[in-house]
């Protein structure tokens, strides 16, 4: 039962509360709430349709069926309100009380509540220390249990123990042996033998438990237990016991209340019975379930009265227990109660659970009145903040406002006649409607609302017709198009709502996208095409003369005149005198070379933005809009956007761009390219047939050849189409402007479709790339086989899209749930921690520059330019665009900034750590719900992510393997940790071969000494440079075999095989096609064998041994003499399957749920030197010894490739075997900061591959929520339990509270203190000085030991289920489990998050709903001064 704190006795006591507590209901509390007992199972009389008296719908208990009318009809009308009828006993009141009056059923025997013995963890079982099976035997009346042994002995003459189980036979035998008078003793007499069965027995046992004593006992055994299992068992029980003890601090919460004597009956309106036509009834399942309980209860009552035999009673009691079980939770039972049609009945628990349950259906998803919906059409003449609203819709939506005006003007007298006038659509109505609409915006919403821009406010314009008109620029935000999309219109009613809609939600204020701060109202499709066409330059040629080329004009007006007179073409190159910025940043007149179209465009550009002299593509436009918004203000930008839209449409129409098949140009070189590629493939096959390469290598090389041929062809095609008609080829213009189409699509139209992936059969096989590509393109047309291969990709695409939407939606929901309570609560948390941000590089390419990553953040420390020593930004200052420019110009590579990850605010987060609000470009304000914005920003693009691998219509991506490092700058080389041996490459030239595994190469700028870039040089590569050498740009540093990993001999000597037995540890594979033999290491059946190559020196001494991984190909024979640098073994790299990388959504889910990957790498936890141990159970042991003699051992599966060799030096956090590193390992070894950076970068990587930009902040907010718990390692003297998960802030507060306290070890002669008590030093001093005076033994105390804990990373689902708020957790998942744990622990919900407040019907504590605004009075300055003056007078 829910309890409201501070019940004020005003009209509606529920409105004023700020906490909600939950607990077990005692029988007394149920009776107190109840209005009467339900005695009969009848519902309503089938003839009169009136409720039966004392039945489930009884009017006496639940209230009248008709307003102010008693059952017998003696009292009618409101004047008798509150009278109780003397004939039928019904109170005369309104009928809605039937929604909240509760009844009850008195049970003849106590019944166990199914939630507490059937859900895990089993609460009753844990408290009594009984396993679930045994508990069921008691509850369902199969065994007796000894509650008190008394003087009883069992058949063998031994004393009985508490909780011994007895069959009926044994029970009766024991009763026979006892003296007669034992039965008449009182139950509490220690000599009496008490044994019972059923829930009654459990109730007795629970009532006899002393929770405190049990808690001490379990704590003791948890601390001193040796066996792991018994210890975890004790800790689990302790958790339940502790939650009961904690709950008693707030209100009484007794374990025996888990057993019910009284069952509440919910109000009849919540389980309605509706008459259908034909005399049948539709009823809620609950009525059936209640009826069964009542029937069985009444039958049991009668059987007990007539003293029926025990067997019959027991059966009846068991049936009663089962019927109450199914009433509370029908789905938990094996034998659920079903209807005739075999559908399980919906019990009380089911009405809370799931999407259709109380929480998600009614409390979180309420319906609104005053809304309309219709199809949308484009409204190109609208302003950005306007929308077209059909007249009929507006008259209906604004009806109350219109009625009021009609009555005010005296046109009508009553509301009814006003409605008539409106329905007749008289002219005066439209007149009034025009007035009412002014300054009263509407909200437009398009489902699915994936982010906050899915609902925006517009000023309506009345239009004829039935469709809503939408401004084309806001389509991106709504993700709307005009192919039949519908939108809903809502009307904000109150003045506050109207104000918020106008100030915060108006479309012209939402120009920036909150996910990344880039403009979102960007022209698309035809607008872009028009703007691109008008600003593109075309030069005269002999066959196509451009009018007016190279003329010079005085002003834009002149250009306009020339254009209108037909003397100048739109695309002509001209000169013009116009204002632009000079180098000093001042606006001055200059002569600018430009085109006629650009002059026209610059007429609408605000002066502050200067002269824009570029071809306008979509990307350019986005930057221009962002720039204009930052140098001007919102109204100016909105006006510019509207003008730009008009211009775009106008010139798209003028240009009349369309394309025919002739515009799709196929390069002439295509046939030659394909022939060349075929020749190369032939060559590869020949190599394979001669046995020079393996099948795997052949496959990889073939795929490579086709991939590069395809890339070359695409380049040629693009070049062709780019140079066609000076780039005025319509297809190219559409592509280049960003209006429609992509490089991929052009490639498939003009080049070749390329490589395709095989269908994926089961999870195991398939998904590889088919090595014969599709050579045709869509213009030439595909052959039947090619078409067939294509269809698979196309269909998979469609199926994927459908599945993806649901997945993405679920991801969004989990994100919202985990981060909904992150609100900006304070200005500055004063933390000294932050994160170091550097530019993100991938393969030395800068993916995201330092500036992009720190823009809008707050600097943690002063950032000082190392060249000039000037302070570029002070600590605590926001890094603006201007500061970013200066930082990028300096040689700084890393900046420490504040971050949500390190924010130390106890509630929510602080504004400084969050930084700039991306939707406004200013610092975040307090009350901003940044958690929800983060969830929306990450979830919204989820639908654009691919489901599995990166394909375009099934075309395999995949880049040719890299096989060398080439310098991209000139500079000096610094090489660390380099070991090489002289060897020969495949052509027989002498080369240096690298044999060290952690070789790092730095390229340093000679002048400044700044490191330009760093590379890792792979093991086994041939290196062509020396340390300290100066190289130019484009120097080849090293080369390696991209298809095989190798093991290279470091010494000259003679080879010997060890444990290499044919058929045991290696197989001889004979290639069918070539007849060549290869020795391949296989997993030995005899696990003792360790396949190893030994190298012996001249003297026959062992120089080096090499362990061989499974799947390695031997390149040397036993006894062969070798030179240093000889390749001993080739390990084929796994073929680059398309399905190799978990991409897209599944990868993001994997990261956010903190799941461990399927084949995790084994990671070293310390720095040290590697040596190999034995093989244990199919695992190879790797031993790492640190400098300080610390030794760690790791087991690596034999099937996975080991990345280290004997005597290699490894650092902590380095993988020892192949596979992905698990986030848990990173957290354990490198700490929380590293794992946070890792998660942010990995998730960003997935989005980046799809071309989606999301600011790091959003991920940081979510990851902060995943790291809010710590796991207690050692509880010390706190009340925590070992391995308990605790909120970081609770942990810190608890430790701070204990800090400096003392623990009594020996109380001496003190009467006040007990051993184990925690006291302050002051209390200890006072007590001891008292004892000293009387010469008694002093109290001995020690310092408190505080708890220690380690941070844990939780997946988003677990993190949201473990929030402090049980209401929020219950509405997310596993509703019954959450509620039942909360009830046992007597939890109190402080209503701090957004979700809890929505559920209890309060305003959310964010934005204008922040709690402190409730106590703020708004007044004028004069009022304030007057009030202050009065206050001062009052003081003196």
UniProtKB/Swiss-Prot annotation:
The keyword Nucleotidyltransferase applies. Its cofactor is Mg(2+); Zn(2+). It is an enzyme of class 2 (transferase). DNA-dependent RNA polymerase catalyzes the transcription of DNA into RNA using the four ribonucleoside triphosphates as substrates. Its EC number is 2.7.7.6. It comes from Flavobacterium johnsoniae (strain ATCC 17061 / DSM 2064 / JCM 8514 / BCRC 14874 / CCUG 350202 / NBRC 14942 / NCIMB 11054 / UW101). HAMAP family: RNApol_bact_RpoC. GO terms for cellular component: DNA-directed RNA polymerase complex. The RNAP catalytic core consists of 2 alpha, 1 beta, 1 beta' and 1 omega subunit. When a sigma factor is associated with the core the holoenzyme is formed, which can initiate transcription. The gene is rpoC. Zn(2+) 1 binds at residues 70, 72, 85, 88. CDD domains: RNAP_beta'_C, RNAP_beta'_N. InterPro entries: DNA-dir_RpoC_beta_prime, DNA-dir_RpoC_beta_prime_bact, RNA_pol_asu, RNA_pol_N, RNA_pol_Rpb1_1, RNA_pol_Rpb1_3, RNA_pol_Rpb1_3_sf, RNA_pol_Rpb1_4. The keyword Zinc applies. Belongs to the RNA polymerase beta' chain family. One of its GO terms (molecular function) is magnesium ion binding. Binds 1 Mg(2+) ion per subunit. Binds 2 Zn(2+) ions per subunit. This is DNA-directed RNA polymerase subunit beta'. GO terms for biological process: DNA-templated transcription. Zn(2+) 2 binds at residues 829, 903, 910, 913. PANTHER family: DNA-DIRECTED RNA POLYMERASE, DNA-DIRECTED RNA POLYMERASE SUBUNIT BETA. It catalyses: RNA(n) + a ribonucleoside 5'-triphosphate = RNA(n+1) + diphosphate.
């Amino acid at each position: 039962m829910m309890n409201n704190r501070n019940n004020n006795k005003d009209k509606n006591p529920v409105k004023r509360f700020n906490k909600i507590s939950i607990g077990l209901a005692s029988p007394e509390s149920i009776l107190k709430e109840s209005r009467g007992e339900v005695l009969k199972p009848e519902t309503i009389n089938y003839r009169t349709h009136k409720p039966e008296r004392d039945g489930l719908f009884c009017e006496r208990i639940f209230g009248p069926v008709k307003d102010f009318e008693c059952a017998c009809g003696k009292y009618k009308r409101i004047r008798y309100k509150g009278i109780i009828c003397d004939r039928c006993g019904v109170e005369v009141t309104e009928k809605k009380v039937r929604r909240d009056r509760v009844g009850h059923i008195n049970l003849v025997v106590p019944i166990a509540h199914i939630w507490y013995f059937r859900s895990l963890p089993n609460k009753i079982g844990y408290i009594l220390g009984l396993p679930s099976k045994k508990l069921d035997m008691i509850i369902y009346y199969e065994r007796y249990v000894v509650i008190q042994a008394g003087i009883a002995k069992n058949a063998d003459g031994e004393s009985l123990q508490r909780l011994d189980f007895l069959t009926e036979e044994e029970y009766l035998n024991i009763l026979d042996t006892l003296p007669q008078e034992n039965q008449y003793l009182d139950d509490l007499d220690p000599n009496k033998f008490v044994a019972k069965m059923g829930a009654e027995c459990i109730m007795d046992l629970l009532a006899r438990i002393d929770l405190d004593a049990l808690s001490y006992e379990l704590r003791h055994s948890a601390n001193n237990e040796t066996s792991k299992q018994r210890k975890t068992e004790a800790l689990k029980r302790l958790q339940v016991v502790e939650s009961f003890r904690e709950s008693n601090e707030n209100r009484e919460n007794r374990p025996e209340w888990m057993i019910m004597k009284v069952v509440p009956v919910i109000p009849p309106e919540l389980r309605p019975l509706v008459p259908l036509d034909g005399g049948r009834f539709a009823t809620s399942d609950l009525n059936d379930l209640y009826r069964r309980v009542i029937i069985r209860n009444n039958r049991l009552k009668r059987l007990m009265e007539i003293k029926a035999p025990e067997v019959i009673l027991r059966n009846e009691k068991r049936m009663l227990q089962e019927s109450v079980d199914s009433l509370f939770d029908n789905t938990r039972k094996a034998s659920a109660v079903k209807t005739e049609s075999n559908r399980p009945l919906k019990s009380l628990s089911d009405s809370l659970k799931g999407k259709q349950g109380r929480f998600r259906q009614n409390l979180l998803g309420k319906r609104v009145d005053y809304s309309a919906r219709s199809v949308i059409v484009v409204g190109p003449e609208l302003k950005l903040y306007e929308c077209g609203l059909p007249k009929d819709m507006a008259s209906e939506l604004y009806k109350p406002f219109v009625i009021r005006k009609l009555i005010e003007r005296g046109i009508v007298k009553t509301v009814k006649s006003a409605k008539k006038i409106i329905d007749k659509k008289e002219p005066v109505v439209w007149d009034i409607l025009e007035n009412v609409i002014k300054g009263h915006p509407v909200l437009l919403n398009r489902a699915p609302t994936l982010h906050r821009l899915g609902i925006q406010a517009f000023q309506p314009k009345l239009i004829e017709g039935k469709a809503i008109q939408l401004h084309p620029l806001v389509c991106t935000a709504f993700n709307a198009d005009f192919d039949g999309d519908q939108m809903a219109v809502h009307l904000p009613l109150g003045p506050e709502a109207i104000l918020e809609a106008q100030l915060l939600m108006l479309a012209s204020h939402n120009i920036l996208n909150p996910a990344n701060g880039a403009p979102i109202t960007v022209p698309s499709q035809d607008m872009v095409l028009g703007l691109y066409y008008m600003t593109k330059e075309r030069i005269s040629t002999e066959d196509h003369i451009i009018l007016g080329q190279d003329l010079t004009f005085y002003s834009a007006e002149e250009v306009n005149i020339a254009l209108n007179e037909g003397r100048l073409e739109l695309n002509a190159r001209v000169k013009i005198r116009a204002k632009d910025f000079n180098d000093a940043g001042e606006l001055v007149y200059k002569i600018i070379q430009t085109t006629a179209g650009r002059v026209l465009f610059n007429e609408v550009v605000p002066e502050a933005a200067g002269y824009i002299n570029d071809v306008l593509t979509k990307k350019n436009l986005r930057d221009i809009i962002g720039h204009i918004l930052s140098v001007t203000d919102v109204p100016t930008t909105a006006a510019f956007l509207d003008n730009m839209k008009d211009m775009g449409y106008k010139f798209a129409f003028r240009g009349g761009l369309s394309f025919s098949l002739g515009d799709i140009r196929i390069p002439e070189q295509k046939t030659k390219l394909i022939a060349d590629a075929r020749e190369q493939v032939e060559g590869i096959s020949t190599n394979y047939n001669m046995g020079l390469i393996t099948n795997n290598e052949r496959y990889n090389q073939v795929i490579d050849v086709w991939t590069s041929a395809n890339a070359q062809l695409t380049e040629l095609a693009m070049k062709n189409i780019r140079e066609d008609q000076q780039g005025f080829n319509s297809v190219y213009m559409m592509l280049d402007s960003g209006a429609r189409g992509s490089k991929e699509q052009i490639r498939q139209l003009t080049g070749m479709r390329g490589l395709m992936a095989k269908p994926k059969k089961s999870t195991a096989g398939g998904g590889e790339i088919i090595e014969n590509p599709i050579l045709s393109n869509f213009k030439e047309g595909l052959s039947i086989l090619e078409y067939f291969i294509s269809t698979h990709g196309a269909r998979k695409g469609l199926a994927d899209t459908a599945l993806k939407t649901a997945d993405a939606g679920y991801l969004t929901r989990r994100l919202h749930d985990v981060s909904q309570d992150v609100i900006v609560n304070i200005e500055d948390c004063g933390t000294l921690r932050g994160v170091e941000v550097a530019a993100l590089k991938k393969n030395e390419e800068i993916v995201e520059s330092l500036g992009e990553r720190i823009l809008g953040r707050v600097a943690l420390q002063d950032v000082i330019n190392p060249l000039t020593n000037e302070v570029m930004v002070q600590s605590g200052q926001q890094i603006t665009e201007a500061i970013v420019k200066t930082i990028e110009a300096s040689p700084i590579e890393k900046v420490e900034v504040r971050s949500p990850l390190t924010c130390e605010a106890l509630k929510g987060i602080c504004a400084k750590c969050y930084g700039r609000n991306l939707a406004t470009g200013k610092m975040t304000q307090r009350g901003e719900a940044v958690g929800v914005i983060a969830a929306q920003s990450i979830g919204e693009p989820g639908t654009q992510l691919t489901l599995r691998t990166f394909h375009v219509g099934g075309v395999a991506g995949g880049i040719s393997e890299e096989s060398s490092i080439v310098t991209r700058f000139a500079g000096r080389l610094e090489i660390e940790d380099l070991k090489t041996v002289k060897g020969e490459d495949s052509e027989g030239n002498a080369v240096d071969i690298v044999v060290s595994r952690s070789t790092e190469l730095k390229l340093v700028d000679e002048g400044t000494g700044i490191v330009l870039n760093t590379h890792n040089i792979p093991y086994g590569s041939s290196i062509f440079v020396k340390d300290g050498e100066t190289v130019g740009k484009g120097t080849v540093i090293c080369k390696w075999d991209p298809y095989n990993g190798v093991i290279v001999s470091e010494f000259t000597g003679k080879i010997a095989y060890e444990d290499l037995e044919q058929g045991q540890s290696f197989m001889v594979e004979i290639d069918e096609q070539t007849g060549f033999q290869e020795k391949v290491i296989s997993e030995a059946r005899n696990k003792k064998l360790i396949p190893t190559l030994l190298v012996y020196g001249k003297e026959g001494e062992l120089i080096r041994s090499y362990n061989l991984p499974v799947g390695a190909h031997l390149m040397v024979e036993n006894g062969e003499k070798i030179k240093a640098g000889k390749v001993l073994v080739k390990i084929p790299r796994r073929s680059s399957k398309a399905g190799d990388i978990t991409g897209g959504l599944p990868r993001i889910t994997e990261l956010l749920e903190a799941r461990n990957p399927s084949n995790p790498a084994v990671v070293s936890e310390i720095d040290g030197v590697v040596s190999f141990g034995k093989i244990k159970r199919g695992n190879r042991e790797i031993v790492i010894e640190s400098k300080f003699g610390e030794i760690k051992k790791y087991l690596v599966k034999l099937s996975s490739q080991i990345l280290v060799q004997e005597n290699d030096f490894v650092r902590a956090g380095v993988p020892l075997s192949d596979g992905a590193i698990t986030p848990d390992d990173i957290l354990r070894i490198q700490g929380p900061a590293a794992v946070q950076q890792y998660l942010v970068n990995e998730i960003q990587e997935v989005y980046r591959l799809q071309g989606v930009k999301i600011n790091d902040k959003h991920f940081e907010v979510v990851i902060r929520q995943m790291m809010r718990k710590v796991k207690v390692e050692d509880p010390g003297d706190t009340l925590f339990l070992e391995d308990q998960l605790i909120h970081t802030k609770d942990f810190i507060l608890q430790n701070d509270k204990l800090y400096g306290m003392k623990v009594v070890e020996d109380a001496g002669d003190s009467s006040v203190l007990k051993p184990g008590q925690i006291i302050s030093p002051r209390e200890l001093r006072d007590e001891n000085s008292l004892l000293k005076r009387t010469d008694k033994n002093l109290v001995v105390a020690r310092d408190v030991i505080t708890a220690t804990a380690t941070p844990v990373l939780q997946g988003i689902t677990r993190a949201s289920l473990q929030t402090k708020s049980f209401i929020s957790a219950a509405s997310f998942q596993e509703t019954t489990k959450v509620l039942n744990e909360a009830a046992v622990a007597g939890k109190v919900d402080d209503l701090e998050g957004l979700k809890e407040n929505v559920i209890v019907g309060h305003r959310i504590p964010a934005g204008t709903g922040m709690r402190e605004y409730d106590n703020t009075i708004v007044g004028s300055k004069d009022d304030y001064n007057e009030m202050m003056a009065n206050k001062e007078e009052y003081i003196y």
